Amino acid sequence: MRKIYISIFTAFFASSLGVNAQSLLSPRTQLMLKKGSITRSAYNSTEETTAFVTLMDGKTTTLRTSLAKLAEMAENGQVKRISITGRPQQMLDVAKEETGHADVLSGKSLSQPFTGSGVVVGIVDSGFDYCHEAFCGKHGRLRIARVWEQGTESFEGCSAPQAFGYGIEMTSEEAIRRGKADCETNSHGTHVAAIAAGSSAFLDGKYSGCAPDAEIVLVALDLNSSTLADISNGVRYIFDYAEKVGKPCVVNLSLGNHDGPHDGTSDFDRLADEMQGPGRIIVGAAGNHRKDKFHISRSFLSPDDAPLRTFISFKQKPTSDDISSFVQLWAEKDMDMEVSLSAYSLFQNREMVSEVIYPIEGTKTVKLGSYATGTIEVAAEKNPNNEKLSLFLDSRISTIRNNYGIVLTVKPKSAGKVDIWADNIYLALESKDVEGFTAPASESTIAEVGGTGKRIVTAGAYVTRTDYNSSVLPDESLGALGSFSSCGPTADGRTKPEITAPGCFIISAVSSFDSSGTKIPAASNETSGRVYEYGYQMGTSMAAPFVAGVVATMLQAAPQLSPEVVKDILSTSARSDSFASSLPNSSWGYGKIDALAALSRTLELTDIRNVTNDSAFMPALTVNPDMLSLSFLADAANVSVALRSAEGTCLSSIRLNNVAAGSSQCIPLSSFPSGVYLLTISSGSNVKTVKFGK
C-alpha cells in the first residue's frame, strides 16, 4: 500500500485554520490535518483528493482538490461540512440454472429472451481486463462503451471527463483496447463485470453473465487513494452516460468499508439516494464479514446501567504507518456519556492508566504511558446528517507490552444507544473472556457503500458450488448462506440485505494481466490467437453483480422501474427453502433471488389493462415516500383523481370542481407500502392512467 506523508503541510494547517473552521471538518478529516501528526494518507498538500462538501443550503456534492484548498474552503462561510472518507475494500454456470436465469436468457415460458439489451450496466471497481472476450459481442466488437480510469494521469489521445476533471476517459474501442487494463494486481473488476454482463458468445455461453447483451461502462478506481467521494463520482459518470444515450441503467458496487454510521445517512448514501430514480438503480454487496468481530451495539436504559467495556485488538501487527487503523463510535442524538481509553493488565485484571477522550473539543492525542508505544488520535463531531455524536479513534500504536491490552469504556450519563465499529482490517473488538467485558456479535456486520443505503439494493451470498479443482470448501454447504455473508440490520433497524444470490463459488472471467498469483483457474478459451481465462471467486462481491444483471433484464422489460419497485419485485418473487426460512430476516433478506419469477412479475406490471396514453391532459407528478404531488399545467374543470393499487383496488379518490394552471394537489402516501401504483386523472372526456413506484 502506497504511503505519502503530509507532515510539511500539517504545520501550516494548524496555524492558519481557526477553531470554527476545524468544526466544519469530519473527525477523520480533522485528524488527517492535525498539527504535528505523522498522518498516514495517500495525499500531501499539493496532491489532489476527492471529498464530500456540504453547503449551508444542505446540498452535498463532491469536490476534487488539494488538502490545502480544502483548508481554505473550511474558512468559507458558505461551507457547512467537509469530509474525506477512508478507502474502500473490494468485497456462473450452476448459478444461472439454480436461480431460473437460464430461462430468462432463453426466453423459455416468456414472450422473448431477456438479455439486458438496451440497458447500460456500470461497474465501479478495480482489476479490469478491457480486452477479455467476455466483453465482446458475437462479432468480436467490444461492448464496453466507456472507461474512466480515475487514477491515471495521462494516456495518449485521452483526457479527463469534462464534468470531473481528473483521471482519463476512453471513449473509443481503439483507445479501450490500447488501454488493455487498469492494473496488474487483481482480477476483481473483471470477474464482477463478467458476472453482471459477460458475453454468451464463447464456450457455448457456459460462463456468460446475467445480461450478456447489455452495454458496459467501467470506472476503474485507484484503491491506494480513492475515497467514497470518488465512488460517488463514478456512479454519477455512469448515470450521466446512460442519460446521454437514453437508456436505463444499473450500477454495481462490490465495494465497502466500515467508515460511517451504517444508518443510510452518510454523505455517500445520501448522494446515492439522490442519484437513483426511475431507470437508475444501484446494487451493492453486503460485505464478507459475518464471522468477524468488530461491531458492538448497546442500548443503555439509564445512567445507572453498567458501563460498556471492550478491548481494541490488533488483527495485524501494530504499526504507526497505516491510515486504515481506526475505531468509530456513534451515539444517538442527545445521549450524554463519558468515554475513556486505558491500558489494561491481563495479569492483574485492572486498568493501569486511563484517559477520558470524550467529552472533548476538536481533537485529542492519547498516550498510554509505558504500556504502548505510539499514540491514539481522537476527534469528535456532532454529525449534521443524523445529529449523532461521532467519535473517531485513529490508532498510531506501534508496539504493546506483553499481557496488556487497550480498553475502550463507555459510561452512560443518560439513556441512549451506542454503536462501535472497528475498521476490521487492522483493528477488531473483543472481550478476551474477561468478566464484565463485551464481545462483538454477528449482527449488523453489513458494510457501508453497498450495504446501508436506503435506496440501494443490497445482496447477500449463498452457496451454489463447494468444489473447485478437486478441492472442497470445508465451511460451506450447498444451498446455505455463505459463512462470510454479512448480515443486518442497519443501525436504524432496516432489513439488509434485501435479497441473496449465488456468491460461492462462482466461475467468471479473470484478467489476463493479473500477475498477483491469486487467481484460481477454472477454464480457458483461445480466440484469435489469445488465451482468455476464467476462474473461481467467492463473496458478496459476486452475488451483487448477479443481482445487477437480473435487474438489467428487468429494466429491459420496464425501463422506468424505480429502486423501490425493483426491491418490491425482488422481495415478492424471492424463494424460500429449508435454509432461507422465517423471512424476511437480517441474513437472507426476503430470500433467494428467483430471476424468472422477478422477470415475470416485471412483465405483469407492464401489462396492466385499461391504461390509456392518448390524452394530452396530465399534471406533472412528484413522488416521494410520503407524498404524491400533482402540479397542473393547464386549466381544467370537473377533475377526478383516483389512486389504485397495481391490482386495481381504489385506495384514494379526489374530486376537484376547477383547477387552475400552476395549482397543485397532494395525496398522502405514507400509509401505503412500497410497490407499484396506478393514478387515473380525468377531466370530461380526457382520461389518463399512469404507473408509478413508491
How would you name each of these model-derived features?
Residues 600-627:
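Residue-level detector of functionally pivotal "anchor" positions at catalytic/ligand-binding pockets or at interdomain
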Residues 402-406, 637, 661-663, 673-676:
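A glycine-anchored, Pro-Gly-centered beta-turn/N-cap motif
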Residues 650-671, 685-686:
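Glycine-centered tight-turn motifs at strand-turn-strand junctions
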Residues 21, 674-694:
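C-terminal tail/sorting-segment detector
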